[in-house]
Amino acid sequence: AALLCGKNLLLAGEKATGKNVLAENLATVFGHPAWDISFHVNMDASSLIGTDTFRNGKVEFRPGPVYSCACSGGFGIFDEINMARNEALAVLHSALDFRRVIDVPGYERITLADDTRFIATMNYNYAGTRELNEALASRFVVIRMPALTLEDLQRLLREQFPDLSSKYNKQFGLLFMDIQKKCESGELTSKAMDLRGLLD
C-alpha cells in the first residue's frame, strides 16, 4: 500500500531474512525496471547521482544509478543503506521526500518520474553498519522483517533439499537455531553461520 501511495520502503532486520528478494519481487510485481545499488563506506554522492567524464574530446555527464532510475520511473534498491556515511546519503533527501527532485551540481534539477520508488534494505548489528540519521529514516516507511522461525527453516530445507530425510531436516534446523541463539548471546561470532551459508 505504501508503494501505491508514492512512499519509499525501508526493509530492516537480521541478515538473510529475504529483504533483497522482497525488494526485487516488488519491482517485478509492479512491472518496473530495478536498479540494484550496493552501499559501502566509500560511497559518495557522485557514485549515486553521476559524475563528469571525458568522452570524444569533451566533458559529459555520466548518469549514476539513482539518476537513471529517477528518469526511467524504476525501482531503486538501496542494498545495505546503513553501510554508507550519512554525508554521502544527504544527496538523496530531496529525492525521497515530497519534493521528488535531484539537483545535479553544474547541470540541472530533475524531477523524478511519477513511478519512481526507492526500497532500502539494512541489517541491524552487522559489522560496518551505522545508525541512519533521523532525517533520512523519516523519508521511508519502515518494515521490520520477521526473524526466521524453525518451521520456516524446515520448510526452506524441504524445498532446497527434497531428498533430505525429515530426521536430518529437523536436526539441521535445530542446530541452526541453536547457533543463532549463541550468536545473539555473544557466545559465538555472527560470522559462524547464516541462512545463506546453510543453504549453500
Question: Where are the model-predicted features located?
Answer:
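AAA+ P-loop NTPase catalytic core and its hallmark functional loops
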Residues: 1-178, 184
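C-terminal alpha-helical "lid" subdomain
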Residues: 188-200
